[in-house]
């Protein structure tokens, strides 16, 4: 049986993007700068060249890169909202179409090994080009069309020359610049970092410390890992925690339709079928690997700055951290036979749950938001 047409299209544009950035390593002016002293709580990281970051930042905020000039990267990854979109469960794409997935934060994305929640991109360079070509996101017909548009804009000539010593754009340069800007979005040095790695005893209050103890006691650190000298709060693996099965069950009955930011209405599934709206399940990692074991499995997100990056889960189905804690405490979705065995009911009273939420709040970096405009 052939994959659905939409899945075949997604695989095709992902492959095209990957081909365009092949061979970036060691590409002269694309090379990154020196290794920086790591931010407290994070591993070492090569610092991108400043001119490359500046060009990437300009591209990131530029709506002219979309097919109809209405969308930019920053419209789904809003700096003042933790580089996600707090008002939307899932992103809104070209012509107002509601996408399947919540926009993940870009904070500390330099340390993410496999990009997108299904892990379909191995590098930031490969990831950066995909939204430009996705038919429901920025909807450009080809990278050539994007490059021609950039070359027609006089305000790009100086930034391009500063980054690459030439005034014209290339596919590799476009990918490298966007990736460089994303690599610059580092946010660590949280209260937890100061307490755990910096040994500042008073950096956390007693409730936050109790929340951390519960976090360890109940095995949350198995997936949201803490290493000896740093903590990415992810195992970079893919798990089915039951969320998609729960969402699918709700989809059989009704759908929340976005009317405006923060305003939704519930519409019966039968009514949507009448007007031809496509019914789209999300199979997660399976859409990349086609392995049955990967159905409804999604990449473990980092918990850094999680208090800033709601709504939560790959589909934005939980609006608060308290709701997320309640979901885990209840054992996820027990009716899903493929749910990860590590998801089980937890004995947590109201004070325990509040302490866990307080601990998660202690993971917020003081530099988690950056200026909105280039």
Feature locations, PLM:
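Post-cleavage N-terminal segment of exported redox proteins
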Residues: 1-53, 59, 112, 130, ...
């Amino acid at each position: 049986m052939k994959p659905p047409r939409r899945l075949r299209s997604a695989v095709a544009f992902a492959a095209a993007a990957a081909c365009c950035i092949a061979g970036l390593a060691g590409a002269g002016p694309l090379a990154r700068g020196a290794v920086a002293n790591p931010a407290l709580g994070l591993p070492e990281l090569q610092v991108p060249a400043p001119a490359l970051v500046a060009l990437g930042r300009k591209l990131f905020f530029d709506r002219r890169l979309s097919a109809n000039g209405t969308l930019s990267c920053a419209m789904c990854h809003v700096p003042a909202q933790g580089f996600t979109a707090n008002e939307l469960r899932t992103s809104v794409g070209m012509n107002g179409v509601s996408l399947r997935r919540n926009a993940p934060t870009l904070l500390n994305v330099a340390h993410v090994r496999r990009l997108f929640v299904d892990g379909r991109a191995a590098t930031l360079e490969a990831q950066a080009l995909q939204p430009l070509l996705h038919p429901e996101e920025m909807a450009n017909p080809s990278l050539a069309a994007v490059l021609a548009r950039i070359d027609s804009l006089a305000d790009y000539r100086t930034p391009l020359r500063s980054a690459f010593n030439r005034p014209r754009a290339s596919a590799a340069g476009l990918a490298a610049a966007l990736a460089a800007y994303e690599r610059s979005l580092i946010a660590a040095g949280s209260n937890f970092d100061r307490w755990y790695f910096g040994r500042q005893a008073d950096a956390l209050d007693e409730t936050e410390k109790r929340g951390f103890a519960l976090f360890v006691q109940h095995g949350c650190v198995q997936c949201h890992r803490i290493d000896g000298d740093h903590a990415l709060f992810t195992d970079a693996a893919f798990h089915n925690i039951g969320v998609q099965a729960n969402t699918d069950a709700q989809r059989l009955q009704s759908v929340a339709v976005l009317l405006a930011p923060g305003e939704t209405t519930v519409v019966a599934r039968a009514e949507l079928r009448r007007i031809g709206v496509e019914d789209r399940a999300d199979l997660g990692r399976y859409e990349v690997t086609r392995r049955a074991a990967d159905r409804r499995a999604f990449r473990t997100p980092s918990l850094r700055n999680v208090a800033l990056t709601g709504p939560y889960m790959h589909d934005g189905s939980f609006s608060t951290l308290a709701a997320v804690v309640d979901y885990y405490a209840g054992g996820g979705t027990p009716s899903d036979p493929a749910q990860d065995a590590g998801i089980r009911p937890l004995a947590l009273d109201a004070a325990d749950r509040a302490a866990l939420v307080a601990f998660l709040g202690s993971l917020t970096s003081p530099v988690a938001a950056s200026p909105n405009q280039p």
